[in-house]
């Protein structure tokens, strides 16, 4: 393909901004004559993206939480389709945000523009009929996990498993002692990391639960014990400080500003909200208990739609019940503490499997994704 390659990318939240920026770097390494348009955050803009509007306008979560923003989202998507049809990029890459991106991909593909979707929606878990729209909308699906690629291959959707960028970034072996020294943690203490979520709503549901579980674990565990809690933002720190003000004053807990990777590297075990953070804990080879509580109405709907036996990424990747996972009413302080106790003594079965999974995901994901994108562009 001669001349400047124009690529449109749209990301809807911070994780997509990170993936998009890394992909843009890999594309520029092969094709310096490339131009980026679309929607992205500060990282993608730093790589040269001309963003049509702030990415934060697309960041919304939950089945019912989205309803209040739906008119704006639909309007912005309509504007974006209009602008992209006028700009005629050589290729469109929708990064995650499937409910927003797939509609754009469908319109652009019908207009003769090649389309890629990067990061599979959880179509293998629920709303499986979405695969029909994906087949119509996408020239290529790029997946982070191997079981996703198997799902699409069985349904005749063009797909490439590229691996996960986090598996490339996090080393196969990490230095626990160095991480503890960096956090000024005392030698000889057992360290448990608490990661109750980065969003306000999930922290409101899980924060008090995790704190009460920590209190119960303190009573059950023999020997010195300390908890570390990374705070995703100043707002989340204030939220946690308010929760801790209502608990016992001698609870040995340290709040961190960010530094979640250091907390994972330093700890002996993790109590963690379901989500991407469970993959990070897996890559750091730390035994974990996974918990989650949804908004009641969301859970009432979701429990009838989900088709998989597990909800946590480690179990989905292992294909078995490798880590304890407790959802909704099963996630009680007593149950969480009791599930953590044995992991403080012997968590080896989990961590051996974690190492094998890490190696399977470590594939230089951004380079592979860039190669796949450029192969598709050359066919255009």
Swiss-Prot record:
Described function: Condensation of UDP-2,3-diacylglucosamine and 2,3-diacylglucosamine-1-phosphate to form lipid A disaccharide, a precursor of lipid A, a phosphorylated glycolipid that anchors the lipopolysaccharide to the outer membrane of the cell.
Family: Belongs to the LpxB family.
GO biological process: lipid A biosynthetic process
Protein name (database record): Lipid-A-disaccharide synthase
Record-linked SUPFAM superfamilies: UDP-Glycosyltransferase/glycogen phosphorylase
Alphabetical list of HAMAP family matching this protein: LpxB
Domain of life of the organism encoding this protein: Bacteria
PANTHER family: LIPID-A-DISACCHARIDE SYNTHASE, LIPID-A-DISACCHARIDE SYNTHASE, MITOCHONDRIAL-RELATED
Catalysed reactions listed for this entry: a lipid X + a UDP-2-N,3-O-bis[(3R)-3-hydroxyacyl]-alpha-D-glucosamine = a lipid A disaccharide + UDP + H(+)
NCBIfam families, per the entry: lpxB
Organism: Azotobacter vinelandii (strain DJ / ATCC BAA-1303)
EC id: 2.4.1.182
Keyword Transferase: yes
Gene Ontology CC: membrane
GO molecular function, one term: lipid-A-disaccharide synthase activity
Biochemical pathway: Bacterial outer membrane biogenesis; LPS lipid A biosynthesis
Keyword Transferase: yes
Alphabetical UniProt keywords: Glycosyltransferase, Lipid A biosynthesis, Lipid biosynthesis, Lipid metabolism, Transferase
Signal peptide residue numbers: none
């Amino acid at each position: 393909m001669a001349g400047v390659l124009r690529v449109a990318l749209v990301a809807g939240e911070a994780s997509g901004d990170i993936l998009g920026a890394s992909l843009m770097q890999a594309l520029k390494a092969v094709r310096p004559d490339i131009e980026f348009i679309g929607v992205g955050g500060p990282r993608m803009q730093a790589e040269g993206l001309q963003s049509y509007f702030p990415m934060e306008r697309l960041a919304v979560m939950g089945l019912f939480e989205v309803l209040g923003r739906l008119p704006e989202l639909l309007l912005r998507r309509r504007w974006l389709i209009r602008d992209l049809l006028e700009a005629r990029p050589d290729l469109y890459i929708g990064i995650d945000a499937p409910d927003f991106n797939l509609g754009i991909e469908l319109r652009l593909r019908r207009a003769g523009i090649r389309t890629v979707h990067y990061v599979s929606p959880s179509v293998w878990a629920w709303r499986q009929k979405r695969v029909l729209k994906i087949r119509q909308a996408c020239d290529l699906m790029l997946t982070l996990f191997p079981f996703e690629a198997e799902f699409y291959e069985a349904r005749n959707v063009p797909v490439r498993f590229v691996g996960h960028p986090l598996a490339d970034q996090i080393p196969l072996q990490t230095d626990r002692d160095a991480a503890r020294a960096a956090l000024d943690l005392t030698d000889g203490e057992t360290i448990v990391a608490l990661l109750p979520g980065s969003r306000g709503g999930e922290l409101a549901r899980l924060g008090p639960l995790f704190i009460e579980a920590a209190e119960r674990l303190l009573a059950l565990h023999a020997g010195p014990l300390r908890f570390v809690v990374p705070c995703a933002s100043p707002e989340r720190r204030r939220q946690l400080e308010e929760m801790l003000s209502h608990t016992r004053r001698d609870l040995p807990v340290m709040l961190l500003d960010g530094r979640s990777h250091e907390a994972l590297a330093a700890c002996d075990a993790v109590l963690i909200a379901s989500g991407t953070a469970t993959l990070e804990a897996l890559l750091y080879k730390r035994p974990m208990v996974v918990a989650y509580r949804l908004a009641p109405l969301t859970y009432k709907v979701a429990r009838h739609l989900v088709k998989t036996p597990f909800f946590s990424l480690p179990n989905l990747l292992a294909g078995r019940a490798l880590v304890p996972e407790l959802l909704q009413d099963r996630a009680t302080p007593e149950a969480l503490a009791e599930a953590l106790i044995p992991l403080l003594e012997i968590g080896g079965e989990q961590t051996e499997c974690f190492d094998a999974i890490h190696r399977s995901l470590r594939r230089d994901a951004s380079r592979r994704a860039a190669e796949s994108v450029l192969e598709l562009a050359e066919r255009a």
